[in-house]
Amino acid sequence: MIRQYLEIKKQYPDAILFFRLGDFYEMFFDDARLASRELEITLTGRDGGSERVPMCGIPYHAADGYIARLISKGYRVAICEQVEDPAEAKGIVRREVTRVITPGTVTEGHFLEDKKNNYLASIAPFEEGYGLAVTDITTGVFMVSSFSGVRAWSELIDEMARLNPAEVIIPLAYSDKMGGDLKQQGILAVSGYRDTAFSPAEAVPAFEEQFGSAGSLCNRTIDYHAAVAAAGALLIFLRETQKRVLKHINKAAFYRPGKYMILDANTRRNLELTRAISDGSRRNTLLSVIDHTVTAMGGRLLRNWIEQPLLDVAEIKARLEATEDLAGNAMLRLELKSLLKNVYDLERLTGKISFGTANARDLIGLKKSLANLPLIKQLLLAQAGAALLKDVARSIDPLEEVRELLEAAIDDNPPLSLKDGGIIKKGYNHEVDRLRQARREGKSMLAGLEERERARTGIKSLKVGFNKVFGYYIEVTRANLELVPEDYQRRQTLANAERFITPELKEYEDMILRAEERLASLERRLFDEVLERLSGEIHRIQKSASAIATADALYSLAEAAVKGRYSRPEIAEDGKLHVKDGRHPVLEQVMGPGRFVPNDTFMDNEESRFILLTGPNMAGKSTYMRQVALIVLLAQIGSFVPALFARIPVFDRIFTRVGASDDIAGGQSTFMVEMNECRIIVNEATEKSLIIMDEVGRGTSTYDGISIARALAEYIHTKIRAKTLFSTHYHELTDLDSMPGIVNFNVAVREEGEDIIFLRKVVPGKSDRSYGIQVARLAGLPGEIINRSMEILKTLELAAERPPQPSPAKEWPAYRYKENECHVIQELRRLNVLEMTPLEAINKLYMLHKKLTESATLKTTSL
């Protein structure tokens, strides 16, 4: 048996092998050590000849929970089942791996989030870029894209941040090169897969077998070879792990990420669109505020809308029109919600049908869902006015014949397992009805036999029973054994009774069990036939599921608009952004009605495209800037916005440089993280972007910080010309308002003695104080520290008013140098400043300053 295990394990070296032994899954050798540690189960051993074999095991009926724990940690699990009856086996029972479960191929509902796709991605490098294929095998979605040019990898990483796949496969030859960057995006499972799967020789046939001619992508992308390579490798991986053809994956949808607003990982994190920074949950995120979806399908679609804001004005206006239509009709919303409640997750049901794992209760859920489709269709056609809602209604296929099949074939209240019987409805199949009648008659005969035997023997406690090991029996207590007739044959002895069989009982047993065996086999065959017929209708079910998801997502936007008192934004084509009484959608909900202070925003293309925002900590600068970004994003997904009035131009990207933290794993300081984020902004932002920059330069010394912040502000204003909200504590920057297009705003406070009151109102003009000590007092720092802080502040302010004195340090011999001995000055002389960008100049200045500082430190130490 161990030899059999080792032969199978050799085929799946990168998976933990769950090896079926009776009622347990056993693991051996290194798999056992790993599973014992990760699952916290006892590590034992068994005799393996020359050495003791480490082993551990779990009950097969409890395997799902253990598998889920391993998958959540990024492991793969190969399920090895007994594929023949042990009673009929000659020698070792034949075993085969029936499925490999990986983070991206999980299908069981209890492993998954209902309202989140579980994506599996494949990346294929090529000479000028990358091909990408993405699937969610639980729903059948399969998407293909490609990235080329100098920014190909950066764009691909941004797309990975949006998709947040559970697993990514890449060519084995590229696993070291690409794996690190992908894992930095939080993708736990990044796996090298055999290179040949990405080659045209294997990938193209796999693609064409699943979808038809690969040439269908030729007209859509010049990089179709890379896209097909990624898609083909993904399909090969699925076939090798799932051991079946997935019929519900029937369409490869090519898409261009450039069709949507681009949001990099920093922006998604800083705006907390779908995951909170604090704990990674959806609590207190934008999604949590606007998600009023009723179905799991609608929830997944709404999440995708948030992560992919639109750029096409016509599409934005179509969603806004539909949202307005629903928001203005309370009865329509109420009826639609009521009907949607009865629609199950049709997308994932098609996955179960394709996998052959759908049970009878799943089919009853499908039947109930289909019964509501014509009602939803009629409701929208009759009451909706928006063109998008009409299109949705026309896309709903009622699938009447499918519902009629399920109504006729499947019992209305079936058991969960086929083994329990009773799944096929009475009247669907004559033979099923006949066998059930025979079984009932046999059991009625058993009841008559029991009565006759009690009368014949005089044993009133005599009873006829059944168990799976011994079959039917007559049980007699020990006190009555002397009354047992001679024709009773002993079958089993118990502590307080004995069990017998008679020729008549044996005849009834054969009749009943024969009927039950035939009935179970027939029900299984009929159920499989129903599943096969349903698998032929998967495409139609998916089409209706997509329409229902769209209706649900639009309902959610309308419900959020009504509950949040949102207004419909105008889409501006002149580039001007105007928000009246804008509010932060998440904080407003957290704080409760009427407590959030609204603020206005106006930005145009010339006079006020750059807002320089000052004010104390805790005053609300970051909240205000995020608020503007979220209002823009909501408008571009086709949602109403939290404002009295909003006029929003279409932005191609939103950038955020907010917060400060070290990247310890990446070996980057707070300041380096900040500068990397700034580099991305200045390299990738355009005139049509929205930039949010909060406290740039605070990760370094004051003068360095001021210099960098000022240079960045000037560069963004003059070179990029993007609409920008730029907050700072450096009051020296407020004179930037002398440049046309830069305006000063501050967050107002009111002073009362030594205390301040935050008014949370953004008003024109600059702030000349940071109120840091007052904020420290509010935070509860001891009075002794506060008082000492005030003394130090006064001393520093007085010193700032005196003329600067020469530093004695400059007279120290250790700091004297000759010009021809200073490499820094020589390097400065070689620089061509006119050919450098402001950011390059800043970075060079920073490095030269660092060299001088290190040199001075070394000389001082040598003294």
Swiss-Prot record:
Give the UniProt family note: Belongs to the DNA mismatch repair MutS family.
CDD domains xref list: ABC_MutS1
Binding-site residues, ATP: G615, P616, N617, M618, A619, G620, K621, S622
Q: What does this protein do?
A: This protein is involved in the repair of mismatches in DNA. It is possible that it carries out the mismatch recognition step. This protein has a weak ATPase activity.
- The identity of this protein, by name, is DNA mismatch repair protein MutS
GO cellular component, alphabetical, reads: cytosol
Q: Which gene encodes it?
A: mutS
What species was this sequence derived from?
A: Pelotomaculum thermopropionicum (strain DSM 13744 / JCM 10971 / SI)
- Give a yes or no for keyword DNA repair in this entry: yes
Enumerate the Gene Ontology biological process terms.
mismatch repair
**Which InterPro entries would you find in this protein's record?**
DNA_mismatch_repair_MutS, DNA_mismatch_repair_MutS-lik_N, DNA_mismatch_repair_MutS/MSH, DNA_mismatch_repair_MutS_C, DNA_mismatch_repair_MutS_clamp, DNA_mismatch_repair_MutS_core, DNA_mismatch_repair_MutS_N, DNA_mismatch_repair_MutS_sf
Gene Ontology MF term list: ATP binding; ATP-dependent DNA damage sensor activity; damaged DNA binding; mismatched DNA binding
What keywords appear on the UniProt entry? Answer: ATP-binding, DNA damage, DNA repair, DNA-binding, Nucleotide-binding
